[in-house]
Curated annotation (Swiss-Prot):
Gene3D superfamilies xref list: YVTN repeat-like/Quinoprotein amine dehydrogenase
Disordered: annotated segments: 495-514
Pfam family name, one: TPR_IFT80_172
Protein name, UniProt field: Intraflagellar transport protein 80
GO CC annotation: 9+2 motile cilium; axoneme; ciliary basal body; ciliary pocket collar; ciliary tip; cilium; intraciliary transport particle B
Origin superkingdom: Eukaryota
Extent of Polar residues compositional bias: 501-514
An individual GO BP term: intraciliary transport involved in cilium assembly
Keywords for this protein: Cell projection, Cilium, Cilium biogenesis/degradation, Cytoplasm, Cytoskeleton, Flagellum
Length: 1079
């Protein structure tokens, strides 16, 4: 966590009940003068503006709620599913500032709970971001008493907690000090409610938090309960503190955990799935927790505030990232006060002392402890309400790495990208504080992404193919470093400007070109019209940052590239090869072009828990809505491919890969047309490293076509059907996979079926998978699993070597979608085991203020149950055809995040499975066969067998089955290889795949299917085929009797059902038998 800027201000006094109603706009109540105040915090965090917006209210406000920005009622907020339309009527929109003080306005409904038991509904107009005057204007308000709902007109029921349920706020949860919880639903009008739920909890209700549109957590006394308002308010989770002297006073949640703020014990992190404690973060000595808040973005962190002004930043699994204090780590800045007409105001509160009006003289005074704290709606930045003023802070996202390239936030708005291959580090200035960092998980091309409050920035580092294309004379050319990413693509942001800041270059005797440092800089939104043309000097937000002078040109330069306009703050971005997906906080998902960020289409996703529930390739976009509903759309049009199937468990991880099936068939057809056997590869060449394996000489490609310098994948045709593989991991750690098609007609009749209609469960050695990920642009599925005795013994280990059961292995399944194929599993296990016990022990010391061994041990046990591990990205290998350099430019590697990204590491991926995949997809089966023969590994032979089945290559299938030791099946393949036309069903039956019989049956070749099954002595399968086609029973009885008689087994029909079948169908002429064989 970077430092904190505090704004000392005794006027207005005692601000509490912080509630955000805009991306830079919050509302708070003063307990001294009983007025409401608006607080404007621009994303730059350079200043804070405060203004009074209401008259004194008769009773003290002790709780307040409003819908977060982007969650209002709109056309795209329908719960019926995604709509192919842009969200044009959001309750709050990011609008560009105009020259006038009044811009487009929206409305907000604020609900306040008072100490006298009344609810105050305030309807307010909210002006756009460009105005310089007061932003919130109260239109009308109405008060109602909760006594009419609770009973007892004379009793007073202080409203201690409120929560407006998302997405449209039609439901309102009210918690009372007397222990009653009310669920009110809007009926027809703004102030007309119907009571749905009334429950007496027998303890004061301290906090209510909306987990999603259906679930809410209620804290009362020392207990917390999670209810589902759509399932008869059933209880899904319950938890109670062990000590009676403590209470849960604050709540926050991420996609997987629920954070409880306890005054004395500290912050308790509960797993939402199991209800178990996974971490406890105690407060400092003689201090107490007053508030907790979570980020609504992909980083999934949360912060804890204490009464004495300590702010603790944590990861999702409860491990401490950083800590700061208001007293020692904050920079003091003045607060700006404005009146309703925009003029500076010196006195806002009716009760303020005139001697306290000049806050600039008290700039060095302390703001005191913290009353309330909340993240901004876009995450990253947070606002604290203190005893004597306000404070803003910033929690930077964690560093990300692809193995060779690293992206990290080095300042409030500066991003550094480091390329370890070229030893290059570039620093870029973002328009606002950087909130989240992303890597392209599914794209073959590595892309880096960053989000701010209102913009998206995408970098595309140069590929190894581009780097290797430079001349090697005189070593690595300097032009490589100079031409490294100079123009990051970005979306429209606050100031809507890009100003190139010219860096002064020294004369070079080597004739190097002058380099222009591209710097993203934006106008301060709150500047008055006309200030844009002046030179300004930015104040440092934090003491640790050096001041930086920004040069403003007299004329604003337009954006260098066309970009989509982000209406609401982005929450997730998913980077692909041709398309990116930008999901904002309202649920609107914009599919944009990868080259320009220009908008392609927009859909609406009502509920999305994590960016691990989205997967995108060029032909399909899959996502999980509401945790259990899987939907697939075409990113090129926004139309449904699959409207929705229901999974029986919540989905944790979703990944998508491009199927090899279509590539192999296309390559096979191309080879057949050209009359060659696997030498039609034109998209890559192999170097001398693999010359002994594949029979290829370095620098002398044997292909007739020209070869390029890198091993890359064949591009997928846009009209390919059956072109992708989908895999998901649910909360029970069960893996489901399926090969799907891009044709919507294939799923038109599914409706709301179960996911098992398109996916099948996959198991491997009874190991528990923690995370799954396809290697980019392939169907090779990588799984991060726990170490077990059934796995091959590891040759090396990362981490400690003895006394640990916290070990992981990475495995690659080369054919994740398979039926009952009787072959060796094509699964490759990395020879390195990962021991993360040291990471767990480091995380277990969650207390940064005390040294209690028993406390640390307890925390370690809790963290051991978390097991939040992630595969961030898997980069496939790249080869170079050059005798002067190493051929393997980039080896296949995976980037893993252990224990909630507490530690990131790079692990090698088995190379030969990737190489065989590329060879097979390119139709280069001769080299693939040489590779298998040289290595002679059963998983590699099994992978080769699956590719031969897809290509209907019976000749090479015979070799693969021989390598697996399946002599009978190889002999059968040899017997049918002499046929002019080898049927795909016969090929599948050769290895015992029941799908082969289905293929032959669908083609009307029942006789051929029965003959193939009998040749493999699979008489039970042949009998199953005949039961649906009884006219072929004589053929089955004839073949079975003949095969047994040839072995001298004349009594083969003495048992049922063959005894009765031979009596009924045994006397048939041979002419009829031959006729049935041809059928």
């Amino acid at each position: 966590m970077y430092g904190i800027s505090s704004f000392y201000c005794r006027d207005p006094p005692n601000l509490t009940c912080l509630t955000w109603i805009g991306i830079d706009l919050a509302v708070a109540a003063s307990q001294t003068d009983r007025c409401l105040y608006e607080i404007i915090v621009p994303p730059s965090l350079g200043q804070v503006r405060v203004s009074r917006i209401s008259d004194p209210i008769p009773s003290t406000i002790i709780s307040m709620t409003a819908l977060p920005p982007g969650n209002g009622s709109s056309a795209s907020s329908s719960t019926s599913g995604p709509a192919v339309m842009a969200n044009t009527a959001s309750s709050y929109q990011i609008t560009k500032g105009s020259g006038s003080s009044s811009t487009s306005a929206s409305q907000a409904t604020i609900v306040a709970g008072c100490a006298n038991g009344t609810l105050i509904f305030i309807q307010a107009d909210v002006l756009g971001l460009g105005c310089t005057s007061q932003r919130v204007s109260v239109r009308r308000q109405k008060s109602i008493s909760v006594s009419s709902y609770v009973g007892g007109e004379d009793a007073i029921h202080p409203v201690t907690s409120l929560c407006m349920m998302q997405p449209r706020g039609s439901s309102l949860l009210v918690g009372l000090e007397t222990g009653t919880v009310l669920l009110l639903t809007m009926m027809g009008g703004l102030y007309q409610f119907r009571q749905i739920l009334k429950s007496n909890l027998n303890a004061p209700v301290h906090a209510i938090n909306s987990i999603d549109r259906n679930r809410a957590a209620i804290a009362y006394g020392g207990s917390v309960t999670v209810i589902n308002i759509t399932k008869n308010n059933s209880t899904e989770l319950s938890y109670k503190l062990q000590s009676d002297g403590d209470a849960i006073t604050a709540l926050a949640n991420t996609g997987r955990v629920l954070v409880l703020g306890c005054e004395h014990r500290g912050a308790i992190v509960l797993d939402l799935l199991s209800g178990l404690e996974i971490s406890v973060i105690p407060p400092p000595p003689y201090d107490a927790v007053v508030s907790v808040s979570s980020q609504p973005v992909a980083s999934n962190g949360f912060i804890i505030a204490t009464r004495r002004g300590v702010v603790i930043g944590c990861r999702e699994n409860g491990t401490v990232r950083s800590c700061a204090t208001l007293e020692y780590d904050s920079a003091h800045l003045p607060v700006s006060k404005i009146a309703a007409d925009g003029a500076p105001a010196t006195l806002l509160s009716p009760l303020a002392d005139s001697s306290m009006t000049n806050v600039d003289e008290n700039l060095g005074s302390s703001v005191g402890g913290i009353r309330d704290l909340a993240f901004a709606p876009y995450g990253g930045s947070f606002l604290c309400l203190c005893l004597n003023g306000l404070a803003v802070g910033y929690l930077a996202p964690q560093r990300l790495s692809s193995g060779y390239i690293t992206i990290e936030v080095t300042g409030l708005t500066t991003v550094m990208i480091t390329d370890a291959r070229l030893q290059v580090s570039e620093v870029y200035t973002a328009p606002e504080p950087v909130i989240s960092l992303f890597l392209s998980r599914f794209a073959h091309t590595l892309r880096l992404g960053a989000t701010t409050a209102s913009s998206v920035i995408v970098w595309t580092p140069p590929t190894m193919a581009k780097i290797s294309s430079f001349s090697l004379e005189g070593g690595m050319p300097l032009v490589t470093k100079i031409q490294w990413i100079t123009e990051p693509v970005r979306s429209t942001s606050y100031g809507d400007m890009i100003r190139p800041s010219t860096v002064q270059n020294q004369p070079s005797t080597q004739g190097l070109p002058n380099r222009q440092q591209q710097e993203l800089d934006f106008d301060n939104l709150l500047e008055k019209p006309g200030d844009t043309l002046q030179q300004t000097e930015s104040r440092p937000l934090l003491k640790s940052f050096s001041q930086k002078k920004l040069e403003h040109d007299k004329a604003s330069n337009p954006p260098i590239k066309t970009a989509a306009y982000v209406r609401n703050p982005p929450r997730y971005i998913v980077l692909g090869d041709s398309y990116h997906l930008v999901v904002d906080i309202s649920g609107e998902a914009n599919i944009v072009s990868a080259t320009t960020l220009a908008l392609v289409t927009s859909i609406y996703i009502s509920s999305l828990d994590s960016d691990r529930q989205i997967a995108i390739i060029d032909s399909a976009l899959a996502y999980v809505e509401g945790g259990t509903t899987l939907r697939i759309i075409d990113p090129r049009s926004g139309n449904f491919i699959l409207r929705g199937v229901i999974h029986h468990k919540a989905v944790l991880d979703l990944t998508i890969g491009i199927s090899s099936q279509q590539h192999i068939r296309n390559a096979s057809e191309t080879s057949a047309k050209e009359g060659t056997q696997g030498n039609a590869v034109s998209d890559f060449a192999l170097g001398s490293v693999f010359s002994n394996l594949t029979g290829h000489q370095a620098g002398k490609p044997v292909d007739a076509t020209a070869s390029t310098s890198s091993l890359k994948q064949t591009e997928m045709s846009s009209n390919d059907a059956s072109s992708y593989v989908l895999a998901l991991l649910d909360t029970s750690n069960s893996l489901y996979v399926g090969r799907l098609t891009t044709s919507p007609q294939a799923y038109a009749k599914l409706g709301n079926s179960m996911s098992t209609a398109i996916l099948q469960q996959s198991k491997f050695l009874d190991s528990i998978p923690y995370s799954i990920q396809f290697i980019a642009q392939t169907d090779l599925l990588c799984m991060l699993i726990s170490e077990s005795q059934s796995l091959p013994q590891a040759l090396s280990q990362i981490g400690e070597t003895v006394g640990s059961d916290c070990k992981l292995r990475l495995v690659v399944d080369a054919c994740p979608v398979r039926t009952s194929i009787i072959t060796e599993d094509p699964v490759f296990v990395t020879p390195t085991t990962i021991d993360y016990s040291s990471v767990q022990r480091s995380n277990a010391a969650v207390s940064i203020f005390e040294e209690d061994p028993s406390r640390i041990l307890a925390a370690y046990r809790m963290l051991s149950r978390s097991n939040i591990h992630t595969i961030h990205r898997i980069t496939p290998m790249v080869l170079k055809n050059d005798g002067l350099m190493s051929n393997a430019i980039t080896m296949s590697h995976a980037v893993l995040g252990l224990a909630g990204d507490s530690s990131q590491m790079v692990v090698a991926v088995p190379e030969f499975s990737v190489l065989l995949n590329y060879l097979a997809k390119s139709g280069n089966t001769q080299r693939a066969l040489r590779l298998c023969r040289f290595l002679d590994q059963k998983p590699l032979w099994a992978q080769m067998a699956t590719y031969c089945i897809e290509a209907n290559n019976i000749q090479h299938l015979q070799s693969a089955l021989s390598g697996l030791g399946m002599v009978a099946k190889a002999s059968y393949c040899h017997s049918i290889s002499s046929h002019n036309e080898v049927n795909a069903g016969a090929v599948k039956l050769a290895i015992g795949d029941p799908e082969g019989a289905n293929i032959l049956s669908s083609q009307g070749k029942i006789g051929a299917a029965i003959l193939a099954a009998c040749d493999l002595w699979n008489f039970s399968k042949a009998l199953e085929l005949c039961r649906g086609n009884k006219k072929y029973m004589p053929l089955l009885v004839y073949l079975r009797t003949k095969y047994h008689n040839n072995l001298g087994m004349s009594n083969c029909n003495n048992e049922e059902p063959w005894l009765s079948l031979s009596r009924q169908y045994g006397n048939v002429s041979e002419d009829e038998i031959h006729r049935l064989m041809k059928g």
